[in-house]
Curated annotation (Swiss-Prot):
It comes from Arabidopsis thaliana. GO terms for cellular component: extracellular region. Keywords: Repeat, Secreted, Signal. It is found in: Secreted. Residues 1-28 form the signal peptide. This is Cysteine-rich repeat secretory protein 34. Belongs to the cysteine-rich repeat secretory protein family. Its main location: secreted. PANTHER family: CYSTEINE-RICH REPEAT SECRETORY PROTEIN 34-RELATED (PTHR32411:SF72), CYSTEINE-RICH REPEAT SECRETORY PROTEIN 38-RELATED (PTHR32411). Residues 35-137, 145-254 form the Gnk2-homologous domain.
Length: 257
């Protein structure tokens, strides 16, 4: 029997603040799903081939795969016993249904390859992340400040970097406010916002997003925004990622329209 909304809050710390990534082609970014980073939860141990844990884990991954990914988010657990496993999977806000399903397949294969037989771990791709853990917690989830990292374009903007940073930061703050507003039905918070704006001759593209089961989206995004500012002001593109929320800006389009 599978249940939703239970996740680990026992996470090992890692924090990477200046991983540089330069993507030269807009087309390749839009059409591919680039691997970004991963972390194996070695403290949760490994499972043996043919074990009960492996069977339960395979059953859970198949259960998640059967999801239609309508809103691009899944949070599911298989039990509360010693073989308990929780999967949290979320796609970028512009990736859902078939695009999201493809990213799930890619992320699961990547997790199995990079964390072979690990009972827990996290893997991030350009359009989604997959979080696997043995330790469960009930939703709404608290902010995970530990499993985060930043990436930025190695190049700085030309001209007035202070003006660029101010306008970029102001725009990101506007998106954060928008993401924390109710949807059209007034039932749930959006937890996602994207947009573009002109800065001189350049056009800025940006997005912010929270996990659907997060207790406090705005606080997570505001904290991530501050962390991004520490490493990446004046860069031509940057992002800050985690399992609770993420934000990104570029000087080229990177979202589906």
């Amino acid at each position: 029997m599978y249940s939703s909304y239970s996740l680990s809050k026992c996470l090992v710390s890692f924090h990477i603040l200046a991983i540089q990534l330069f993507i030269p082609s807009v087309a390749s970014l839009n059409l591919t799903n680039v691997y970004l980073h991963h972390k194996c939860r070695v403290g949760q141990g490994k499972y043996h081939p043919g074990s009960r844990y492996e069977k339960d884990f395979d059953s859970l991954t198949s259960f998640v795969a059967a999801n239609k990914f309508i809103d691009g988010f899944v949070h599911s657990s298989n039990s509360d016993g010693p073989n308990s496993t929780t999967i949290i999977f979320q796609c970028r806000g512009d990736s859902y249904k078939s695009n999201c399903r493809t990213c799930y397949d890619t992320a699961l294969a990547g997790f199995r390859k990079r964390c072979p037989r690990n009972k827990g771990g996290i893997i991030w791709y350009d359009q989604c992340f997959l979080d696997v853990s043995m330790i469960n917690d009930l939703a709404p989830r608290k902010i995970n400040y530990k499993d985060t990292f930043a990436m930025h374009n190695p190049n700085n903007v030309r001209g007035d970097t202070k003006m660029f940073s101010k306008k970029t930061n102001d725009f990101l703050q506007q998106l954060i406010v928008k993401a924390d507003k109710p949807d059209m039905d007034g039932v749930e918070l959006l937890y996602y916002a994207a947009g573009e704006m002109r800065i001189g001759r350049e056009k800025l593209h940006a997005m912010v997003q929270c996990a659907k089961d997060l207790a406090d989206c705005k606080s997570c995004l505001e904290w991530s925004f501050k962390e991004l500012s520490k490493c990446c002001d004046g860069k031509r593109g940057a992002r800050f990622l985690g399992t609770s929320c993420n934000l990104r800006y570029e000087l080229y389009p990177f979202l589906r329209t």
